[in-house]
Regions:
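Sec-exported extracytoplasmic/periplasmic mature domains
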Residues: 78-82, 101-109, 146, 250-254, ...
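Structured beta-strand-rich core segments of catalytic domains in phosphoester-bond hydrolases
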Residues: 26-33, 90-205
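Bacterial N-terminal signal peptides that target proteins for export
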Residues: 1-8
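N-terminal, active-site-proximal structural segment of metallo-dependent hydrolase catalytic domains
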Residues: 8, 18-107, 113-126, 130, ...
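Active-site beta-strand/loop signature of hydrolases that rely on acidic residues for catalysis
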Residues: 40-46, 73-98, 141, 180, ...
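Metal-dependent phosphoester-hydrolase catalytic domains
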Residues: 21-31, 247-262, 267-398
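Short aromatic-enriched loop/helix-cap "lid" or pocket-rim segments at secondary-structure transitions
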Residues: 52-57, 98-99, 125-129, 153, ...
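Acidic/histidine-rich helix-loop elements
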Residues: 43-69, 161-170, 199-237
Length: 398
């Protein structure tokens, strides 16, 4: 009986081995994964909802308002589904960065994130801070199957001190850049990606300069030179920040071969400004210049975005200080001209690149702009969404 059973088992094993060797029983060969035909990258200043003064920070919206803006933003992100998302004014970190990941996961999207705090006040440990609601900063999200690795939280400018996830010491305005590398496993290509929020100060340098120069020519503003020096200081600080950024990007490129470089954020300068020209001389291209139709979208528009209009109500402390020695009449004139200048729509958010998907068709559009006038906005800025396509008809249809 046992011998018969062994004979049967042996025969079945032999038959199964033979069947597996037959062509009809070969396991299917793994199918090659086709790389995606489009790649989307978004930069967006999300608005932290804080009022920042020289010595203090306070929340200027209710928790309900903050949550409503976040929910709207997640819906907009889920619809656009960018492959890489560059965010500024993400507060508080690291909690808010993880909130983005989890909220997008609930929409069926799998993202990973890296982040860097750029404003923290005095924070000695988790839960032990002078400004407990402040741990603002930058985040980069990458959609699966992309992988992301943080390279550097780079301090661009500011006094001694620094900010981290759970501890930090800040004695004045700090500005950081967040550098990361993003790899596409389907192609094996790795890209150098960065985001930053540059110094603001007295905004619209060139326009305000023209307005104040005109007032000075009419016999107003006896301390005009002091105002001009303050404007130039803001410009100079941003140039230093860009120099620090570009030096770091070059260093990373020396140690690793990247298929391209792209960075973006709220840069607080405008087209043809000295800072804009500085990037051009360094070999970086404003991607709007190479996009189909060369769109020049206004990313900050106080006339159509109520959140932006509200942000412009407060005058920059540096501007108030620079006017302190002027007569009341001249102060009022300078403020009027300043408000006129900053009330105009303008482009201060950018995506700059170097050798990034240069063979693709590129289109650029605004992100987060309400479809109808009066609909809510999720930020005081509109984002910029770049779509790179390797199907030429996507360009021909526009």
């Amino acid at each position: 009986m046992n011998r018969c059973r062994l004979l049967v088992i042996g025969t079945m094993a032999w038959l199964l081995t033979g069947c597996q060797a037959m062509p009809g029983f070969m396991p299917p060969a793994p199918q090659p994964v086709e790389p995606p035909t489009t790649f989307k990258i978004l930069t967006y200043n999300t608005l932290h909802g804080l009022e920042v003064s020289k010595l203090w920070v306070r929340q200027v919206e209710t928790d309900k308002q903050h949550k409503a803006r976040f929910t709207l933003r997640i819906m907009q992100l889920a619809e656009a589904q960018p492959d890489v998302i560059l965010l500024q004014e993400v507060n508080p970190l690291p909690v808010m960065a993880e909130d983005y990941v989890q909220a997008l996961k609930q929409q069926g999207l799998d993202y990973a994130e890296v982040h860097q705090v750029d404003a923290c006040g005095l924070r000695l440990a988790p839960g032990l801070a002078i400004l407990p609601g402040l741990n603002n900063g930058l985040a980069i999200l990458a959609k699966a199957p992309l992988t992301i690795r943080k390279l550097d939280g780079l301090k661009l400018s500011g006094p001694l001190g620094g900010c981290g996830d759970y501890a930090g010491v800040q004695f004045g305005e700090l500005r950081y850049a967040l550098l990361a590398e993003v790899t596409a496993p389907t192609t094996g290509m790795t890209y150098l990606v960065a985001t930053m929020h540059l110094h603001s100060g007295i905004e619209r340098d060139a326009k305000v300069l023209h307005e104040l120069m005109e007032a000075h020519s009419q016999g107003r503003l006896q301390h005009y030179d002091q105002l001009m020096a303050e404007l130039k200081m803001d410009e100079h600080r941003r140039q230093i920040e860009l120099h620090t950024l570009m030096d770091a990007l070059r260093q990373h490129q020396m140690h690793q071969h990247y298929a391209g470089v792209i960075f973006g954020g709220d840069l607080n300068f405008e087209v043809e400004s000295p800072e804009y020209q500085q990037l051009g001389r360094a070999g970086f291209t404003d991607t709007a210049q190479i996009a189909v139709g060369m769109p020049m979208w206004n990313t900050y528009d106080p006339m159509s975005n109520p959140l932006a209009g509200h942000e412009e109500e407060a005058l920059p402390p540096a501007f108030i200080e620079a006017l302190a020695q002027e007569m009341k009449m001249d102060q009022d004139e300078a403020v009027k001209r300043y408000r006129h200048a900053i009330g105009m729509a303008r482009r201060i958010d950018f995506l700059f690149s170097m050798a990034f998907m240069s063979n693709a068709c590129l289109t650029q559009e605004l992100f987060g702009k309400p479809a109808m006038m009066g609909d809510p906005s999720s930020s005081d800025h509109y984002g910029l969404l770049n779509t790179y396509s390797y199907q030429r008809r996507d360009c021909e249809q526009r």
